[in-house]
Structures are given as structure tokens and as C-alpha cells.
Amino acid sequence: FLNSKVLREVQNIRYQLFRVLHRNGIRATESRDEDAIGKSIAAGLIENLLEYNSRHAYQRIKDGSWGFYIHPSSVTFGEDPQFIVAAEIVSTNKTYARVNQQVKREWLKEIAPQFISEAPRSIYYDEEADKVIQEVSLYLKQTRSIVDLEKRQVTGEQAVEVFVEALMENKIDYPL
């Protein structure tokens, strides 16, 4: 059910935000872009970024603490999304995350760079791109969950070594 008091509070906060934007000369637009809205909410609550672990339990990324559960009153209850942010953490017989926003994995690089580390992987010559490439895994520091795999161009001495090796192995068709 919708609580009229909460809806009035939301409306008042919205009005205050529009006033602040106007006062600072920022043009406000109304967006229906769910990803942009979701990212904004998640970025504001990033300290309570939680990752699903098992048996409906979550781990907080910031400090690695365990045993968070989605509150039964939450719209995400029973869904067990991989990542959520919580506006409230309440403790009763369990520790519950309330007022949650689901977070998409692809948002994490943008909204939570402070929680991400890099691990270099293989370096190779990419024939199609005609470049030396290094794969780099991006992962969450506390849980080591992979967030993304980036391919970056390698330059300098290391690129020369890989290129020469590819030439010697006839991986490069070099016209004379």
C-alpha cells in the first residue's frame, strides 16, 4: 500500500531539489530513463552496496560483513538480485536491508570505482585489430566477484616483445 505521509514527503523533497537546481542555474529535466534513475539512487547509497551470497543472504562490499537479508516488506524480497543498495539497515532477529534498489553489474565501474581492483591477465597480439592487447579483470575487492573484463592496448617495450613473438610464430602475415 502507499502511505500518503511518505508520498507528501517525497513530493516536498522533489520540490526542494528543483528549487536548489533552479537557484544554482541548473536546468532540470524529467527523465524516464530507468538506468539513469537507478544509477543515481545507487550512487547515493553506495556505502550499503550488498552482493548476494547464498541462502538469501548478502555481503556488504564496503567492509565484507555478512548476514544481510532483504526485508520482507521490500519489493525485491524473494527475487535475490545479485547486487542491491539499501537505504536502511535494521537489526531485529536478523539484519535486514530495507528500501532497496537493484544494481546492475555494468553500473559498478561507474558508481563504485572505490570498491574495484584490477588484475592483469593475458597479453597477446590481436590480428584483427593489428594491436597488442592486454586483458584486465575488474573485480570487487571484498568478494573478488568479476565486474568486467577490459581489453587495453599495450604500447612500449612489452608490445614490441609480443609483436616480435607473433612474427616469429607466423601469426602475422607481413607483406614484403
Summary of predicted features, one role per range:
Residues 1-67, 80-176:
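Acidic, serine/threonine- and proline-rich low-complexity intrinsically disordered segments
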